[in-house]
Swiss-Prot record:
Record-linked Pfam families: tRNA_int_end_N2
Ranges annotated as biased composition (Basic and acidic residues): 45-55
GO biological process, one term: tRNA-type intron splice site recognition and cleavage
InterPro entries: tRNA_splic_suSen54 (IPR024337), tRNA_splic_suSen54_N (IPR024336)
Protein name in the entry: Probable tRNA-splicing endonuclease subunit sen54
Role played: Non-catalytic subunit of the tRNA-splicing endonuclease complex, a complex responsible for identification and cleavage of the splice sites in pre-tRNA. It cleaves pre-tRNA at the 5' and 3' splice sites to release the intron. The products are an intron and two tRNA half-molecules bearing 2',3' cyclic phosphate and 5'-OH termini. There are no conserved sequences at the splice sites, but the intron is invariably located at the same site in the gene, placing the splice sites an invariant distance from the constant structural features of the tRNA body.
Family: Belongs to the SEN54 family.
Start and end residues of each stretch annotated as Disordered: 37-57
Keyword tRNA processing on entry: yes
Transmembrane segments: none
Keywords: tRNA processing
Subunit annotation: tRNA splicing endonuclease is a heterotetramer composed of sen2, sen15, sen34 and sen54. Interacts directly with sen2.
GO cellular component, one term: mitochondrial membrane
Length: 384
């Protein structure tokens, strides 16, 4: 989930062309015969770009558009023995599959004593949306995709939760719901808080203090005076380099202590999903430590987390037992890290937050081979 170097848009400006901006030529789909039960994926043809005003281009676009709609209108057929039918249980808020088969159920659903597979709302909606399963009501009526959406989304916690779940599943991850996911059956969108006069007053005073801190009143009063360049160090006399680096530290390093996990149901930032990388040894009955812990938030009703909210989020995450050997990898991942999935009107962005303690004193490590550095004498004085 980390950004790769080849994804950098500035590495090769000549070859970064978005093919989705081009109008596709869908006329090759007209070769698909509707009366056949099996289809083969046809080869892609040439692309038709924006209309240029000519009748030839207009006719080509009409034929391409008609071929696309004709291909979408083809009735998809499936044999009865391969069909997966689920029954929606409104009382439990889950769907039940009597006969589950296929590789998808290796990472989805929970089996009971009667060998029935129970699916969570997001799992049910994902399988119905991708066309792998049909969902029926308890009355024996087939449910449309819109009906499954209306029944499942409130039980998923929010629409953003399902969007992130479906995206991770399409990327190949095995996604397990965390026990901390909030479920709101009636209304799953929080209204924004209305600020009163007291809140506005403190907000104005805070903004005013920030503006005043940016001014240099001494320079405004004496614009032509020359001042001696000051050091960023607090002291003037040092005897070792360790004292210099210790004085330069703004936030002191610390060693994390393993303690009981603290969870808070009031915070907007909570672990929503546990994501696992694709692996043949993955078992739902014996889950290991997840590769990623996902916290889903909406950009429309959620502000930037405060330091207290981030600390509470880290407090609900256990410490890593095996740290990476590479120093920069340890700085990147930290003792614990969380992926914040920000959903902005369907557009998902992932941000990693890591608990990096900076407890390693790299300036005292001179054990590398080939290094000509030596320890400084303790009589080193007057470093400014």
């Amino acid at each position: 989930m980390d950004a790769q170097d080849e994804d950098n848009p500035f590495t090769n400006l000549e070859t970064t062309v978005d093919v989705t901006e081009e109008i596709q030529d869908w006329r090759f789909l007209s070769n698909v015969e509707k009366d056949q039960g099996t289809y083969t994926i046809p080869k892609r043809g040439q692309k038709d770009f924006e209309p240029d005003g000519t009748n030839k281009q207009h006719s080509a676009l009409d034929l391409s558009r008609k071929a696309m709609f004709d291909a979408l209108s083809v009735e998809r057929l499936i044999s009865a023995k391969h069909a997966i039918i689920a029954t929606w249980n409104a009382q439990n808020g889950m769907s039940c599959v009597e006969k589950a088969h296929g590789p998808l159920f290796k990472t989805m659903g929970t089996a009971d004593s009667q060998n029935r597979m129970w699916l969570l709302p997001e799992e049910t909606l994902y399988l119905v949306e991708r066309g792998s399963m049909e969902c029926w009501s308890e009355e024996g009526l087939p449910m449309s995709l819109q009906a499954v959406y209306s029944a499942s989304i409130p039980l998923c916690g929010s629409l953003e939760n399902y969007l992130v779940y479906a995206h991770l599943r399409r990327c190949g991850f095995s996604v397990i719901r965390s026990n901390l996911v909030p479920v709101k059956e009636d209304e799953y969108r929080c209204d924004s808080k209305i600020m009163n006069f007291k809140d506005l007053l403190f907000l104005g005073l805070g903004k005013a203090s920030q503006i005043l801190q940016t001014f240099n009143f001494r320079k405004l009063a004496f614009p032509f005076s020359k001042r001696r360049r000051q050091s960023i160090l607090l002291h003037d006399t040092f005897y070792t380099y360790e004292e210099v680096y210790h004085d330069l530290q703004i936030v002191r390093g610390y060693v994390p202590i393993a303690c009981n996990l603290i969870t808070s149901s009031d915070s907007l930032f909570q672990i929503t999903f546990h994501a696992y990388k694709p692996s043949a040894s993955f078992k739902k009955s014996a889950l290991s430590e997840p590769d990623f812990r996902i916290c889903v938030v909406s950009s429309q009703d959620t502000l930037l987390p405060t330091i207290f909210e981030i600390d509470a989020l880290f407090s609900s995450t256990p410490l890593r037992q095996n740290m990476p050997q590479h120093m920069f990898q340890r700085l990147k991942e930290g003792y614990r890290n969380i992926i914040i999935a920000i959903v902005d009107y369907g557009v998902i962005s992932y941000i990693r937050l890591s608990d990096v303690c900076f407890e390693e004193k790299v300036y005292t490590d001179f054990s590398k081979k080939g290094s000509k550095r030596k320890r400084v004498s303790k009589k080193f004085q007057q470093l400014v």
